[in-house]
Amino acid sequence: MLKEIRPALVVLVVLTVICGLAYPLAMTGIAGVLFPEQAAGSLIVKDGAVIGSALIGQEFKDDKYFHGRPSATSAADPADPTKTVSSPYNAANSSGSNLGPTSKALNDRVKEDVDKLKAENPSAAVPVDLVTASGSGLDPEISPEAALFQVPRVARARGLSEDGVRKLVNAQTKGRFAGLLGEPRVNVLALNLALDATTRK
């Protein structure tokens, strides 16, 4: 019987070493050499401290900052571990919403967000990504339209000209990859850092 089991055990050990140890270490090493920033998590450092990642969104509530997409991520309720509470941009629990298009709770939330945004900028159409969560709940980017929609509020809150803030948005807008893939986008954290740097000058 041992004769029959031995080849299977040898294959198990060999594949475990190759797939579970050698391959991950090799890929991590290669990534660290070829793409050091991305391999380390695309971390953004300010004044020697890590303040975020270019790959994970953050919640900004202050009027003087651009806001990202809504996030449907949650966390365990400290008062009752069998329940969850809203925890926007919780990278430990990446998820979208389970609410479907016929959900009253979802429709009420979207309507409330639209009304709030309309009050902020009555003359413009509300971009869809400002009222809909992404599938991961961690999207760090918004469309240029969503950023431009927020320009009047941010300019007002900071005492800046709308034209100057608009130019900053345009400067932070990334185009399609190779001119073909994806959509133009703006990283919210990078935009807010650029805004802070401009305001300090």
From Swiss-Prot:
The residue ranges flagged as biased composition, category Polar residues, are: 83-105
| UniProt subcellular location | Cell inner membrane
| Sequence intervals crossing the membrane | 10-30
The yes or no answer to whether the keyword Transmembrane helix is present is yes
Tell me which domain of life the UniProt entry assigns to the organism this sequence originates from: Bacteria
Q: Name one GO molecular function term.
A: P-type potassium transmembrane transporter activity
User: What membrane topology was assigned to this protein in its record?
Assistant: Single-pass membrane protein
- Which InterPro entries does the protein's record reference? KdpC (IPR003820)
**Compositional bias ranges of the Low complexity kind:** 70-82
Q: Which Pfam families match?
A: KdpC (PF02669)
GO CC terms: plasma membrane
Instruction: Give the keywords, sorted.
Output: ATP-binding, Cell inner membrane, Cell membrane, Ion transport, Membrane, Nucleotide-binding, Potassium, Potassium transport, Transmembrane, Transmembrane helix, Transport
The ranges of region (Disordered) come to 67-105
NCBIfam families recorded: kdpC, PRK00315.1, PRK13999.1
Name the family.
Belongs to the KdpC family.
What biological function has been recorded for the protein in this entry? Part of the high-affinity ATP-driven potassium transport (or Kdp) system, which catalyzes the hydrolysis of ATP coupled with the electrogenic transport of potassium into the cytoplasm. This subunit acts as a catalytic chaperone that increases the ATP-binding affinity of the ATP-hydrolyzing subunit KdpB by the formation of a transient KdpB/KdpC/ATP ternary complex.
Q: How does it assemble?
A: The system is composed of three essential subunits: KdpA, KdpB and KdpC.
Protein's name according to its UniProt entry:
Potassium-transporting ATPase KdpC subunit
- What organism does the record attribute this protein to? Rhodopseudomonas palustris (strain BisB5)
Q: What are the leading ranks of the lineage?
A: Bacteria, Pseudomonadati, Pseudomonadota, Alphaproteobacteria, Hyphomicrobiales
Which gene name belongs to this protein?
kdpC
